[in-house]
């Protein structure tokens, strides 16, 4: 768009429908372009071009279309895409979903202005994710190890304590190694005022805000802002990682609310719906978010992602978790059954998986026994869980002594490894030592997945 076109104000609004506005007689307009809108009473609003074709532009108005009409509304196309001013001073601050300060502090003086859609990374320029990120949560660090540059979602359900777990991870997460800089970028989308107050209070009172940048989009904020929020958060993370050399953990919650906003906007545009009414491009859209995690050759910093989503009706085959699973590198599944038992965090390790766990385990990263002892504990816990079904039919008296030991191990594993205080920050060494202690419940001859050398080195003597 040339300079002349940037000064033209259009009054050719032909239709307003929900958050969308259609402008006729437009030339040289690009998809994603930012639009300045003047309401009939002189107020200023901002929008973004969602569709441009045959001299028609469809614009999503960020602040909604109330008080706008087709005769007096003025529109100016800026020629710019959505950008955010970023700075190292964003650490310790809380912003709304559009990147405006929410904590009463001053506006950020930008060191750079970056396109919120990021820049495509040549796959050849990527380094494989590696090195351990410690969350202080045993069921993540031990069995589903998080690796720098990885993207691993948490699959939750309505009413499960994913918000509590998210703030615990944000508070406790760290990278090991002298001189390594670490930060958390936390973005909440479509949350209630009560949830917003919980997040802000937790970050402030625990001191976690010092190393964090927080973005909060409320349920009553415009749907388009919900689409922008994760992109703004990821752009901030990329700046801290690739410009400032920091290792950044990005926590995005709740991606289900994000996808509902996608569906709302698609319906307003009369698009042909895909599975369960979600737009057909939802897979591509989610990939554009998740694939912004990683390590880049020549850059010290990394971006690691933990997106959190609530599965409608606890259905893991729902399009949102289903498509997410195709893109990401595993999943951490919260269990309603464990939650009913009073276990926190209710992480079910059997359906959970970190596909890159091996990249962050072992000597020099965690400990030499990590992968072997976890394999042994996982197998024993799975067998113990299976025996519970048998006990429900035949009773515990029908079990052999061997089977009883596995049943006892499963109960102990849930009560001492899975169960953890909300303020309990365990090192990986503590987690592994706890597991070795539990393995003493099993007969020595059943420890088939760990070597005699490791048993002699780490297994406590009875």
From Swiss-Prot:
Q: Which Pfam families match?
A: ATP-synt_ab, ATP-synt_ab_N, ATP-synt_VA_C
Lineage, top-rank taxon, reads Archaea
**A single MF term (Gene Ontology):** proton-transporting ATP synthase activity, rotational mechanism
According to the UniProt record, one GO cellular component term is:
plasma membrane
Which InterPro entries does the annotation name?
Answer: ATP-synt_VA_C (IPR055190), ATPase_a/bsu_AS (IPR020003), ATPase_F1/V1/A1_a/bsu_N (IPR004100), ATPase_F1/V1/A1_a/bsu_nucl-bd (IPR000194), P-loop_NTPase (IPR027417), V-ATPase_su_B/beta (IPR022879)
PROSITE patterns assigned: ATPASE_ALPHA_BETA
Keywords, alphabetical: ATP synthesis, Cell membrane, Hydrogen ion transport, Ion transport, Membrane, Transport
Matching Gene3D superfamilies: 3.40.50.12240
Main localization category:
membrane
Q: Name one GO biological process term.
A: proton motive force-driven plasma membrane ATP synthesis
Q: Does the keyword Oxidoreductase apply?
A: no
Q: Where in the cell is it found?
A: Cell membrane
Q: Keyword Transmembrane, does the record have it?
A: no
Q: How does it sit in the membrane?
A: Peripheral membrane protein
State how it assembles: Has multiple subunits with at least A(3), B(3), C, D, E, F, H, I and proteolipid K(x).
Main role?
A: Component of the A-type ATP synthase that produces ATP from ADP in the presence of a proton gradient across the membrane. The B chain is a regulatory subunit.
Its family? Belongs to the ATPase alpha/beta chains family.
* Protein name per Swiss-Prot or TrEMBL: A-type ATP synthase subunit B
Chain's gene name: atpB
């Amino acid at each position: 768009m040339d300079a002349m076109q940037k000064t033209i104000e259009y009054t050719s609004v032909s239709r307003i429908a929900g958050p969308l506005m259609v402008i006729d007689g437009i030339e040289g307009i690009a998809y994603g372009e930012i639009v300045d809108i003047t309401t009939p009473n002189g107020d200023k609003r901002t929008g973004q071009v969602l569709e441009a074709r045959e001299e028609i532009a469809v614009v999503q108005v960020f602040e909604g279309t109330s008080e706008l009409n087709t005769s007096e509304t003025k529109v100016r196309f800026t020629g710019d895409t959505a950008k955010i001013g970023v700075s190292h001073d964003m650490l310790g601050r809380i912003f709304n979903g559009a990147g405006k300060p929410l904590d009463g502090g001053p506006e950020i003086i930008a060191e750079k202005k970056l396109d919120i859609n990021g820049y495509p990374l040549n796959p050849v320029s990527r380094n494989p994710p590696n090195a351990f990120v410690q969350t202080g949560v045993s069921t993540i660090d031990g069995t589903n190890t998080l690796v720098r540059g990885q993207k691993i979602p948490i699959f939750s359900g309505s009413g499960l304590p994913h918000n509590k777990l998210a703030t615990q991870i944000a508070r406790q997460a760290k990278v090991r190694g002298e001189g390594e800089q670490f930060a958390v970028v936390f973005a909440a989308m479509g949350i209630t005022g009560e949830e917003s107050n919980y997040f802000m209070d937790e970050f402030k009172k625990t001191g976690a805000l010092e190393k964090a940048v927080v973005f909060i989009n409320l349920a009553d904020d415009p749907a388009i802002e919900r689409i922008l929020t994760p992109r703004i958060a990821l752009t901030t993370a990329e700046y801290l990682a690739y410009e400032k050399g920091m290792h950044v953990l990005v926590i995005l919650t709740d991606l289900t609310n994000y996808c509902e906003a996608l569906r709302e906007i698609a319906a307003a545009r009369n698009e042909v719906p895909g599975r369960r009414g979600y737009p057909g491009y939802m897979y591509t859209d989610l990939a554009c978010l998740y694939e912004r995690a990683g390590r880049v050759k020549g850059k010290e910093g990394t971006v690691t992602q933990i997106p959190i989503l609530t599965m409608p009706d606890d259905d893991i085959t729902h399009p949102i978790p289903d498509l997410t699973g195709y893109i990401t590198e595993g999943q951490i599944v919260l269990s309603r059954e464990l939650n009913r038992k009073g276990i926190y965090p209710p992480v079910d390790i059997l359906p959970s998986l970190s596909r890159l766990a091996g990249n962050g385990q072992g000597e020099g990263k965690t400990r030499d026994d990590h992968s072997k002892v976890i394999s042994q504990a996982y197998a024993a816990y799975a067998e113990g869980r299976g025996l519970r079904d048998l006990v429900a039919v035949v009773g515990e008296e029908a079990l052999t002594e061997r089977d009883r030991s596995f049943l006892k191990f499963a109960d102990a594993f849930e009560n001492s490894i899975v169960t953890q205080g909300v303020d309990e920050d365990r090192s990986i060494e503590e987690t592994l030592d706890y597991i070795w202690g539990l393995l003493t419940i099993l007969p020595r001859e059943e420890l088939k997945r760990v070597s005699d050398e490791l048993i002699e080195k780490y297994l406590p003597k009875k």
